[in-house]
């Protein structure tokens, strides 16, 4: 029979000034352990990794984001799993620091002893917290000062979130997330409650936040634009009178002839445009694919 483990994790949440990041990591990792620094933009990842390399051995810093070509990214992901994955040893984890973007928060199974992160919408933030104290196999390896999970929210002076964060995530959702975050979270018990509070339509608890009304209007306008772009390419509902004569495929093909595929993709895709690049390299005077 399969065994179900009702595991609950209490995560304490604190703030950390960005200027104190290096000092904080030195203090927290002085007895060993590993840390994950998860940031909202690639630029922030690059700048932070560069800064940390000036104070920590290069082999202790792993930079990971979406701008690496596939072979390099795969190599870094493998290194992350070796150093912080389920089979990682205390020696492999000792002093290791991951500096990563959203590329690391979803599909990679790693376990950090402490998490430092920029603020992001509640569902993403909770997903990041799920990469902390993830494997019970590592509990006996954790230094005493890192024996209990902590999530440090990076702040830049009085600002709770950076301009880059507001460019990636709606400021409206960041405001609501910041307002509902408690000082500690029980995972998974508190997940539904926190997410529902952030995405609920009710505004009563948020109206006194400076700039909240304008942020909400911008969010609603953007959501309206996205719905409008998508609705223009919805398939028509089948007509009752013709339903027996025309299959769903017939109706799909009829609708498809009205829409240019590239125009449709550009209109409904939720995100910026992207280009697919083929990377070449020079070997012995010859050009070949990487």
Model-derived features with residue positions:
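Interdomain hinge/linker at the junction between the two RecA-like core domains of SF2 helicases
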Residues: 1-24, 28
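Short amphipathic alpha-helical segments, especially helix-boundary/capping motifs
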Residues: 2-3, 22, 54-56, 102-106
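A short linear-motif detector with a strong N-terminal bias
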Residues: 14-17, 93-96, 126, 130
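Flexible glycine/serine/alanine-rich "lid" or loop that lines and gates the nucleotide-sugar donor pocket
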Residues: 109
């Amino acid at each position: 029979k399969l065994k179900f483990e009702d595991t609950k994790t209490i995560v304490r949440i604190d703030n950390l000034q960005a200027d104190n990041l290096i000092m904080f990591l030195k203090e927290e990792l002085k007895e060993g352990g590993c840390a994950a620094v998860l940031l909202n933009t690639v630029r922030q990842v690059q700048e932070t990794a560069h800064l940390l390399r000036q104070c920590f051995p290069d082999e202790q810093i792993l930079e990971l984001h979406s701008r690496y070509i596939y072979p390099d990214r795969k190599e870094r992901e493998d290194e992350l799993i070796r150093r912080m994955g389920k089979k990682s040893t205390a020696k492999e984890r000792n002093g290791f620091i991951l500096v990563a973007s959203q590329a690391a928060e979803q599909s990679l199974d790693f376990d950090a002893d402490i998490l430092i992160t920029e603020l992001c919408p509640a569902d993403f933030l909770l997903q990041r917290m799920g990469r902390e104290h993830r494997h019970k196999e590592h509990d006996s390896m954790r230094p005493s000062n890192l024996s209990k999970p902590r999530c440090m929210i990076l702040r830049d002076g009085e600002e709770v979130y950076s301009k880059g964060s507001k460019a990636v995530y709606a400021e409206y959702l960041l405001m609501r997330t910041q307002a509902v975050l408690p000082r500690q979270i029980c995972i998974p018990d508190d997940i539904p409650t926190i997410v529902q509070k952030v995405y609920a339509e009710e505004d009563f608890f948020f109206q006194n936040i400076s700039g909240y009304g304008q942020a909400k209007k911008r969010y609603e306008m953007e959501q309206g634009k996205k719905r409008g772009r998508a609705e223009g390419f919805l398939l028509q509902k089948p007509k009752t009178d013709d339903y027996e004569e025309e299959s769903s495929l017939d109706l799909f093909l009829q609708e498809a002839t009205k829409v240019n595929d590239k125009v449709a993709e550009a209109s409904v895709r939720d995100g910026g445009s992207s280009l697919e690049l083929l990377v070449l390299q020079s070997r012995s005077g010859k050009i070949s694919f990487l």
